[in-house]
Amino acid sequence: MAQLETRTEPMVVNFGPHHPSMHGVLRLVVTLDGENVIDCEPVIGYLHRGMEKIAENRTNVMYVPYVSRMDYAAGMFYEAIVVNAPERLANISVPKRASYIRVLMLELNRIANHLLWLGPFLADVGAQTPFFYIFREREMIYDLWEAATGQRLINNNFFRIGGVACDLPYGWLEKCIDFCDWFAPKIDEYEKLITNNPIFKKRIEGLGTIERDQAINWSLSGPMLRASGVSWDLRKVDNYECYDDFDWKIASEKEGDCYARYRVRVEEMRQSLKIIRQACEMIPGGPTENLEAKRMATDDKKSDIFGIDYQYVAKKVAPTFKIPNGELYTRLESGKGEIGVFIQGNNEVTPWRFKIRAADLNNLQILPHILKGAKIADIMAILGSIDVIMGSVDR
């Protein structure tokens, strides 16, 4: 008796675009053979707002409030890179105290970014409970931002050419250390719940594997690169701001799968806590209360401490600051990877060219490659492990 052969026709399915609060307005045109993915075409651009052209028609002071809306989970990083580019082009130095304040804000943002990634990622693979624990700690970071900048999630508008908008408020460093003391055991709690959970490990181990050479050839960065065995972090490589003052290590894994990317991000939160603690202890001038006491002791309203006016921790750059002739590319390590800005000035208040390199756009490009051969149920787990924010991808 002849054996019947079952043949299936490929089926094209549209995933998304989803609501921005989920995985963003990303559309995946997926070709399926049964439950197996045989092709995937990402469709982007739904959230394109012309951020580069806006930058070319605004002064730097006017443009800084815009940029946190690109990656609305990590706005501080874009504020930093947008002011770093003209600073380097014009050779503007940053006071040491301002540099320490920047590092504090960036590392808090790195933790907030990873927490915002971790909660939805766990929900994607079926673990709902940790989602609520993670958002509890994230709110504490936003409380610190609100005290320092007046805003919580986006539109902090805190970074300035030459420094930051203002000094830290009274008691802020103490509250920041309190947060570190609170959050460190919470990471251990997450790991007890998640890391060695047999259901979680079986769900994502070996899923979406990226080899070391593939990660390099696809220009991946951040946890996507370090999870594939490449120990590359711009905080160590470029030593921007004052990261060379601190003792910390690069988090990396070798397996290159979704589980390795999870392990890298959890370890990065631990390392960020180490940096924050050291910055709080080593910040020039100490807490703001100490600076005020020194000013009152000297009876000098414009006390020059560490070469800066303590009331405004920045070199005061005029709103009509002209970007000098020249061009350069500057970069930094965000929670998602390398973000950079290519700026070209022509001695005008607005740049002639302003090109933004988003980490998640480069990381997203490998998605069709690692989805081929996967099951339809694994699509959201693999996409979630990449950590994309479509405002940053589309710009």
Curated annotation (Swiss-Prot):
Topology relative to the lipid bilayer, per the entry, is:
Peripheral membrane protein
Protein's name in the database? NAD(P)H-quinone oxidoreductase subunit H
InterPro entries attached to this UniProt entry: NADH_Q_OxRdtase_suD, NADH_UbQ_OxRdtase_49kDa_CS, NDH1_su_D/H, NiFe-Hase_large
**Keyword Magnesium in record:** no
Q: Which PANTHER family did the record assign?
A: NADH DEHYDROGENASE [UBIQUINONE] IRON-SULFUR PROTEIN 2, MITOCHONDRIAL (PTHR11993:SF10), NADH-UBIQUINONE OXIDOREDUCTASE 49 KDA SUBUNIT (PTHR11993)
- Family named by the database record: Belongs to the complex I 49 kDa subunit family.
Q: Which NCBIfam families match?
A: PRK06075.1, PRK07415.1
Q: Using the UniProt record, name the top-level EC class of this enzyme in a single word.
A: translocase
- A Pfam match is Complex1_49kDa
- Return the HAMAP family for the record: NDH1_NuoD
Q: Which organism is it from?
A: Prochlorococcus marinus (strain MIT 9515)
Q: Does the keyword Translocase apply?
A: yes
Q: What is the role of this chain?
A: NDH-1 shuttles electrons from an unknown electron donor, via FMN and iron-sulfur (Fe-S) centers, to quinones in the respiratory and/or the photosynthetic chain. The immediate electron acceptor for the enzyme in this species is believed to be plastoquinone. Couples the redox reaction to proton translocation, and thus conserves the redox energy in a proton gradient. Cyanobacterial NDH-1 also plays a role in inorganic carbon-concentration.
EC nos? 7.1.1.-
Keyword annotations: Membrane, NAD, NADP, Plastoquinone, Quinone, Thylakoid, Translocase, Transport
